[in-house]
């Protein structure tokens, strides 16, 4: 119990010292050159805040979801050594049907088309 109290008091002391040091140190003002983007010594050609394509975002999310689902299929051959086929085959078929229905749904809604 004394070890916990000792570690807790050291943690509080370090937090107090860091807080006092943050208030004691002078505030540094930033100038325009420090806050401007650096691009290999040249002035930036375009704005750094370009709008992001929502279509690209959706395709990236779809890729991650399908990639995760495919990664969940990898342990099925190893599970066939432990689980009887009468249990494993229906589970894997349900999983494949869900994966296929998701693909068909995205295909019908146009989520896989890059250009309109």
Swiss-Prot record:
It is found in: Mitochondrion membrane. It comes from the Eukaryota. Its EC number is 7.1.1.2. It catalyses: a ubiquinone + NADH + 5 H(+)(in) = a ubiquinol + NAD(+) + 4 H(+)(out). It holds the Pfam family Oxidored_q4. GO terms for cellular component: mitochondrial membrane; respiratory chain complex I. It is an enzyme of class 7 (translocase). Its main location: mitochondrion. Core subunit of the mitochondrial membrane respiratory chain NADH dehydrogenase (Complex I) that is believed to belong to the minimal assembly required for catalysis. Complex I functions in the transfer of electrons from NADH to the respiratory chain. The immediate electron acceptor for the enzyme is believed to be ubiquinone. PANTHER family: NADH-UBIQUINONE OXIDOREDUCTASE CHAIN 3. This is NADH-ubiquinone oxidoreductase chain 3.
